Amino acid sequence: LECHNQQSSQTPTTQTCPGETNCYKKQWSDHRGSRTERGCGCPTVKPGIKLKCCTTDRCNK
């Protein structure tokens, strides 16, 4: 599986995720504004954080 792994509005980059079946995209706000994190897997998140998990290559744009 290949997932995007750039933070927020950085130039898109990807990583290969051996053995993983999910990519994720987390979004939240802090004192610097809206934040986005992407990567392999499907992590558990705290309340107030939006999480989208998906199962195809580069699906977490």
Curated annotation (Swiss-Prot):
Gene3D superfamilies recorded: CD59 (2.10.60.10)
Claim: Secreted is one of the keywords in the record: yes
Subcellular location(s) per record: Secreted
GO cellular component: extracellular region
InterPro entries for this protein: Snake_3FTx, Snake_toxin-like_sf, Snake_toxin_con_site, Toxin_cobra-type
Keyword set, alphabetical order: Acetylcholine receptor inhibiting toxin, Disulfide bond, Ion channel impairing toxin, Neurotoxin, Postsynaptic neurotoxin, Secreted, Toxin
SS bond partners: 3-23, 17-40, 42-53, 54-59
GO molecular function annotation: acetylcholine receptor inhibitor activity; ion channel regulator activity; toxin activity
rRNA processing found in the keyword field: no
Tissue expression as described in the entry: Expressed by the venom gland.
Pfam families attached to this UniProt entry: Toxin_cobra-type
Family according to the record: Belongs to the three-finger toxin family. Short-chain subfamily. Type I alpha-neurotoxin sub-subfamily.
Task of the protein: Binds to muscle nicotinic acetylcholine receptor (nAChR) and inhibit acetylcholine from binding to the receptor, thereby impairing neuromuscular transmission.
UniProt protein name: Short neurotoxin 2
